[in-house]
Amino acid sequence: MKNKATPIDIETLVDESLLVFIASDDVQDTLQGVRRGIEREMLRVTPSAQLSHRPHPKSLGSALTHPYITTDFSEAQLELVTPAVTGRKETFKKLASLHHFVATHLPEGESMWAASMPPSLPLDSDIAIANYGTSNVGMAKMRYREGLANRYGKRMQLISGIHYNFSLPKPFWQMLHANTESQLPLEDFISERYFHLIRNVLRNGWIIPYLFGASPAADKSYLRDKPYQLLQLDSTTDYLPWATSLRLSNLGYGSSEQSRFPISFNSKQDYLIGLCKALTQPSVQYSYLAEHQQLNGSVLQLENELYGSIRPKIVNAQMRPLVAMCHYGVEYIELRSLDNNPLLPLGIDELQSQFIDLFLLYSALSPSPEISKQERTLIMQRQELVATQGRKPNLMLPTLNGEVLLTDLAKPLMNLLAKMATIMDGGQNTNGYEKAVMREQAKFDTSQLTPSAQILSVMEQENLNFTTLMKSYSDEHQQGYLSDTLSDDEMTQLQMLAYNSLLEQKQLEAGNEENFDEYLAQKRHINCEMPSRADAALSMQRYSMQFQDNKEPANQL
């Protein structure tokens, strides 16, 4: 682990010393404590594959206060959230249970849209922003979404995906801390190592859209009035023949204004300085908007507005993330670059989860130099090339060493992941990791096995447009959700959560102690220079009382 790596060789580096570290029985024991959680966004659609105009069903509870079933940008955009637990099977069982519960409580005829790219969309004026009621916290969430709509348009916000939350246990970090002979205090070491992980994910993150991208096509209504040159499969479907993920491309989720303020992941300090600047710097593009049209006129209204494929995260309901991370560090990462795979009932499966865990563990252990401006540009270029042309034969990707064949760039990483998989399976008496790597390696050997290729193949062979095929998958999965069963205890628990969340929202609405303008004025205040943890807790005490939201981080808007 003490080998030095220079930026010039990082993209092809194979560091065998990490294999020695993870092969230890003690380290294998700690890895049983890896926690993961999944958040899946999906649109509610009508039998004719139109965006639902109905409100979020009350039978699902309050979108404001329910811990597992909420909404994202739109009233018709569900978000299902599993708690972070150590058991992978438990995570997927919970995710399946949430799908079943939602399916049984949707308005008649509605289903959950299986794809990341939305179906045929109405005009922006006919897309309803999520409604969170009349409490101050609820109205703030709605004002934030008004800001998103006015800044980026509503259609972009309706792109859905999967967020994968991942944390390594403290005993693992303690062993790595000793192994690397780090002079940093343990808590600082953990935070910096999460940024270390993030940098490696950024470097090698192009493999995510290649392997798991599932949005090579979109309904024509999404690109209405946008100057992008896509091919037409038919009069309703735009696509790119070699694309893996339009969602992750420049025509998907992104912000030109944010690109003017690139935030560094070279250290916790660099990240927080950049984030604070974006939260306090008046935006050239958005300052003209009226107060009621957004939370504020900064480049970022809130931390959550920061777009990117991966984020450092901390859960602390007592203070906003900027301050909490400043004083308590990073607790976990959120991988945000996963498309909903419409070929899978849950949009993701356990083998994919095992591969992602391996990739993230590799990223935490492999050398990770700072990312220069030059390398950051190359990372963005690789991402765009793979998102729009990833399956193109003999595609060359730019690196610090010049252009490299995509499959050649993948080889050292996949070889090392295969070795890690053997060690992990041996230590945990399974064979899932090796199966996961073999399945993904096959996609590099044969690009037709990627989900993006499979989707386009079905469209072309069966002469189906995007919306028709995705509606077919959605209906098929809906029948599967309905045929699943929950135990009486599970169903009762979910029904009680829904009921209690509605009560909690009413209590919040009855407890407004100040007018909304005063509430927002407090929310706009950011102190980026709090000198101590005690001062941070004291300064944020009032903030905490105002913004606690569903026992989640106060800023989860």
What are these regions (language model features)?
Residues 2-149, 156-162, 189-192, 196:
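Terminal catalytic/cofactor-binding subdomain
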Residues 24, 138-154, 158, 167-327, ...:
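Loop-rich catalytic cores of soluble enzymes, especially ATP-dependent carboxylate-amine ligases
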Residues 37, 93, 97, 139, ...:
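Generic recognition of stable, solvent-exposed alpha-helical segments in well-folded globular domains
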Residues 41-43, 156-169, 332-339:
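Histidine-centered divalent-metal-coordination microenvironment in nucleic-acid enzymes
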Residues 53-56, 92, 125-126, 176-177, ...:
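Short conserved micro-motifs at the rims of enzyme active sites and ligand-binding pockets
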Residues 118-120, 218-222, 376-386, 433-443:
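A glycine-rich phosphate-binding loop feature that marks nucleotide/adenosyl-phosphate handling sites
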Residues 326-328, 333-421:
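Substrate-recognition/cap regions that form aromatic- and gly/pro-loop-enriched pockets
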Residues 429-557:
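Extended, compositionally biased alpha-helical segments that mediate assembly or anchoring
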